[in-house]
A protein has these predicted regions:
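Active-site-adjacent elements of ketosynthase-type condensing enzymes
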Residues: 46-55, 114, 118, 197-224, ...
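Glycine-/small-residue-rich "gating" segment that lines the acyl/pantetheine channel
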Residues: 128-135, 176, 180, 184, ...
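Short glycine-aspartate micro-motif
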Residues: 5-7, 104-108, 188-192, 224, ...
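Short polar catalytic/cofactor-binding loops
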Residues: 10-17
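Condensing-enzyme catalytic core mediating Claisen C-C bond formation in acyl metabolism
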Residues: 4-8, 31, 35-36, 219-299, ...
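Conserved beta-ketoacyl condensing-enzyme motif
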Residues: 7, 22, 28-163, 195-205, ...
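Short beta-strand segments
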Residues: 11, 108-110, 165, 190-196, ...
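Active-site-proximal alpha-helical scaffold in enzymes
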Residues: 80-93, 144-147, 152-155, 160-195, ...
Length: 314
């Protein structure tokens, strides 16, 4: 028998708000979080505006030990751990350290890159013949699955622990993968989400491709203009988002607050064929994905009243 899947926890680390309350306030009051960065101007980037979450050392120490933060230089993992743990707590799930792993709990937490700044730091050391000084945490900070490894260790997760990576669809894909695993009865709760590193070494390639806006360096908050005729490119930014997906029966049994039910979803690819390319979607694939998502959810187009589009302002 297929299980019903619900969302019981949320966490967010965004340029316009770290934590649900701050983020919700920013969204309701039109606060974008996009600002001008002197570092990007110094490096002569065409686009000198960006979004970066404001995470203080004081806040970081609420999620990491001082030892863990020694030689730590991976913003994507920082953002992802904060969002993930916040979502877990928001779901009312235990943070108490147990001897046994949580065999029914796992994480599928996506990332596009991991520890780019740590890579840069390490490259300089290696080139200076100081490879032995890299430190014992360099690998976990720079491997793509570092975020899921950190979360699994902090939460004692014993079910599937995976990092997916599919460019702009990474976060949505993690939710669908988590949904499928719970629906099939292979897990009772999965922490799903995605995260992204910040800084010029992540954003530089996009700036070189000339896909970032260059017309709004003097007016950062007007830079991102999706669906506008005056759109001149996207604004680079970083952060993380997380959701706890849970077997509805288990959630109800423990009296959890339920935000929503996940009815279904679909994943496909345009194969870079027809009108599709590496960056441009294949229109036929988009149609098929939407149609199959509605079919798997048991709804019709008339039932859809909100569309959260992938609006990059390119």
């Amino acid at each position: 028998m297929e299980k019903r899947v619900v969302i019981t926890g949320l966490g967010v680390v965004a340029p316009n708000g770290v934590g649900l309350d701050a983020f919700q306030y920013a969204i309701k009051n039109g606060i974008s979080g996009i600002r001008h960065f002197e570092e990007l101007e110094r490096l002569k980037f065409s686009c000198q505006i960006a979004g970066m979450p404001n995470v203080s050392m004081e806040l970081a120490l609420q999620y990491f030990t001082e030892l863990e933060l020694k030689n730590f230089n991976a913003t994507g993992i920082l953002y992802g751990v904060i969002a993930g743990i916040d979502a877990w707590k928001d779901a009312g799930l235990s943070m108490e350290i147990q001897e046994e792993p949580d065999w029914d709990g796992g994480t599928i937490f996506g990332a596009g890159t991991s520890g780019v700044e740590k890579f840069r730091e390490s490259i300089y050391k290696i080139d200076d013949f100081k490879g032995r000084n890299l430190g014992s945490t360099t690998v976990i900070q720079t491997m793509n699955s570092g975020i899921s490894a950190y979360l699994a260790g902090k939460l004692g997760l014993g079910n599937q622990v995976t990092t997916n990576s599919s460019a702009c669809t990474t976060g949505t894909e993690s939710i669908i993968m988590a949904y499928d695993r719970i629906k099939s009865g292979q897990a009772k709760r999965i922490l799903a989400g995605s995260t992204s590193d910040s800084g010029p070494y992540v954003w530089g390639g996009f700036d070189a491709m000339r896909v970032c806006t260059f017309r709004h360096n003097d007016s950062p908050v007007t830079g991102s203009r999706p669906m506008s005729q005056s759109a001149s490119g996207f604004v680079p930014a970083s952060g993380a988002g997380a959701l706890v997906l849970e077997d509805m029966e288990a959630a109800l049994a423990r009296g959890a607050r339920i935000y929503a039910e996940v009815l279904g979803g679909d994943l496909n690819s345009g194969g870079q064929r027809g009108l599709g390319t590496l960056t441009a979607p294949n229109p036929l694939a988009v149609q098929k994905c939407i149609q199959n998502a509605m079919k798997s959810s048991g709804i019709t187009a008339q039932d859809v009243d909100v569309i959260n589009g992938h609006l990059t302002a390119t």
